[in-house]
Amino acid sequence: MWSDPIADMLTRIRNANVALKEQVDVPASNLKKEIAEILKREGFIKDYTYIEDGKQGIIRIHMKYKGTRRNRERVIHGIVRVSKPGRRIYVGKDNLPKVKNGLGIAILTTSKGVLTDKQAREIGVGGEVIAYIW
């Protein structure tokens, strides 16, 4: 049993990215699906698919790279887990973080659902900062 399933998901994505893997499998949950949807929408991954396995299911994340198959360049340059089970990090609507001066995104859980920092700024809500991705 993991103590932090979100950190496990982000670590699997980070490791697959470093190893230049085509895809990575992650145990599914609703929060992980929403995070994968944000990563797809923001262009950090190609796509993801939900695979029913009779238990909780699996999310298969299809990684995205620039360039040819021989000379690949990573789209994801860094992933950092911010709010952890031992230390939750919350921000108000006035203190929403900008990752790498706007080149990256912060993923937040808010009362309006899982959002990027840009979406939260537009709506005017704060929340718990899950991760930074650039």
Curated annotation (Swiss-Prot):
One Gene Ontology cellular component annotation held by this UniProt entry: ribosome
Record InterPro entries: Ribosomal_uS8 (IPR000630), Ribosomal_uS8_CS (IPR047863), Ribosomal_uS8_sf (IPR035987)
Pfam families named in the record: Ribosomal_S8
Keyword annotations of the record: Ribonucleoprotein, Ribosomal protein, RNA-binding, rRNA-binding
Does the entry feature the keyword Mitochondrion, yes or no?
Answer: no
Query: What family does this chain come from, according to its entry?
Result: Belongs to the universal ribosomal protein uS8 family.
What is the name attached to this protein's record?
A: Small ribosomal subunit protein uS8
List the source organism. Thermosipho africanus (strain TCF52B)
